């Protein structure tokens, strides 16, 4: 029932289509079967019958002239079905009876379900002279009496009486629902797949960043190797300092020895000079 309610809501919001007019024509024809129409006389009424339009043409003109809303037309279909259940199966009428029945149902639907509706004189004009104002007033009173002045129509009545129009919409809704379910299922599977792979990629990216942050760009040495290298540099510096000090001491010793040699040489020269001069 929920699916039919959705379909009914869509149908009531839709414009009047040829399918709706055909549905109304078929519904009206089932109220009084055409086999029950009397044989038309061959005298003055013949002129009247020659200009009687087909029921579908008659309904199409009324829809075009009045710009009637879809809910008003569909409610008239409910009145037609109520009238069908009330009338005896062997009910007879004139060839224009089906036109009168539909027009009376449409007038009552427009007056009962709309705040404003055309007057009966306007309805007489919409029939292109097929019916007079007196005809309109008479058929309206007769229909009210047949329906016992009960013009109420509920959702269940509409769903029951409009099945031929609701079924295609219901099937379209079911197909659309299945398509949405398949799309949602595919999107859910894609999200699950992405959720299953994204954390691994993210963790690998962070691990790579941490690895690059802790390792020197210009060297592949490990931390232990770097520490050993620093110690070797310190030892090399100490050895260099010692060597420098040794060289400095050696130079100092050489300078002292050279000075001593000079002193000794000078002392030797002085003695020689003194001996030469008899000192």
Swiss-Prot record:
Keyword Phosphoprotein: yes
Gene3D superfamilies, sorted: Cyclin-like (1.10.472.10)
One BP annotation, GO: G1/S transition of mitotic cell cycle
Superkingdom of origin organism: Eukaryota
Pfam families: Cyclin_N
GO molecular function: cyclin-dependent protein serine/threonine kinase regulator activity; protein kinase binding
Induction cue: By transcription factor SBF (SWI4-SWI6 cell-cycle box binding factor) in a cell cycle-regulated manner. Peaks in G1 phase.
Keywords: Cell cycle, Cell division, Cyclin, Cytoplasm, Isopeptide bond, Nucleus, Phosphoprotein, Ubl conjugation
Glycyl lysine isopeptide (Lys-Gly) (interchain with G-Cter in ubiquitin) crosslink location in chain: 82, 121
Localization annotation: Cytoplasm; Nucleus
Segments of this protein annotated with the region Required for degradation by DMA1: 29-36
Modifications the protein undergoes after translation, according to the UniProt entry: Phosphorylated by PHO85; necessary for interaction with DMA1 and subsequent degradation. Ubiquitinated by E3 ubiquitin ligase DMA1 in response to nutrient condition; this targets PCL1 for destruction.
Subunit structure: Forms a cyclin-CDK complex with PHO85. Interacts with HMS1, NCP1 and NPA3. Interacts with DMA1.
Protein role: G1/S-specific cyclin partner of the cyclin-dependent kinase (CDK) PHO85. Essential for the control of the cell cycle at the G1/S (start) transition. The PCL1-PHO85 cyclin-CDK holoenzyme is involved in phosphorylation of the CDK inhibitor (CKI) SIC1, which is required for its ubiquitination and degradation, releasing repression of b-type cyclins and promoting exit from mitosis. Together with cyclin PCL2, positively controls degradation of sphingoid long chain base kinase LCB4. PCL1-PHO85 phosphorylates LCB4, which is required for its ubiquitination and degradation.
PANTHER family on file: PHO85 CYCLIN-1, PTHR15615
Protein name: PHO85 cyclin-1
Organism, as annotated: Saccharomyces cerevisiae (strain ATCC 204508 / S288c)
């Amino acid at each position: 029932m929920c699916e039919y309610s959705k379909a009914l809501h869509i149908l009531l919001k839709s414009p009047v289509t040829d399918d709706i007019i055909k549905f109304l024509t078929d519904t009206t024809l089932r109220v009084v079967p055409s086999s029950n129409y009397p044989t038309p006389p061959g005298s003055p009424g013949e002129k009247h019958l020659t200009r009687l339009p087909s029921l579908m043409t008659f309904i199409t003109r009324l829809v075009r002239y009045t710009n009637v809303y879809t809910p008003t037309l569909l409610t008239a279909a409910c009145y037609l079905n109520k009238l069908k259940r009330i009338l005896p199966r062997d009910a007879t009428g004139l060839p224009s009876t089906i036109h009168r029945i539909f027009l009376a149902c449409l007038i009552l639907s427009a007056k009962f379900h709309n705040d404003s509706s055309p007057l009966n004189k306007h309805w007489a004009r919409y029939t292109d002279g097929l019916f007079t104002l007196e005809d309109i007033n008479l058929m309206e009173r007769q229909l009210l009496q047949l329906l016992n002045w009960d013009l109420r129509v509920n959702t269940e009545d509409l769903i029951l009486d409009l099945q031929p129009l609701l079924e295609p919409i219901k099937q379209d809704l079911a197909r659309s629902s299945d398509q949405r379910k398949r799309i949602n299922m595919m999107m859910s599977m894609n999200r699950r797949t992405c959720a299953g792979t994204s954390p691994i990629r993210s963790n690998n990216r962070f691990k790579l960043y941490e690895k690059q942050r802790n390792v020197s760009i210009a060297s592949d040495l490990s931390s232990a190797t770097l520490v050993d290298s620093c110690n070797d540099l310190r030892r090399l510096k100490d050895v260099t300092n010692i060597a420098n000090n040794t060289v400095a001491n050696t130079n100092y010793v050489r300078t002292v020895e050279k000075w001593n040699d000079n002193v000794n040489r000078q002392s030797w020269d002085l003695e020689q000079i003194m001996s030469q001069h008899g000192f």
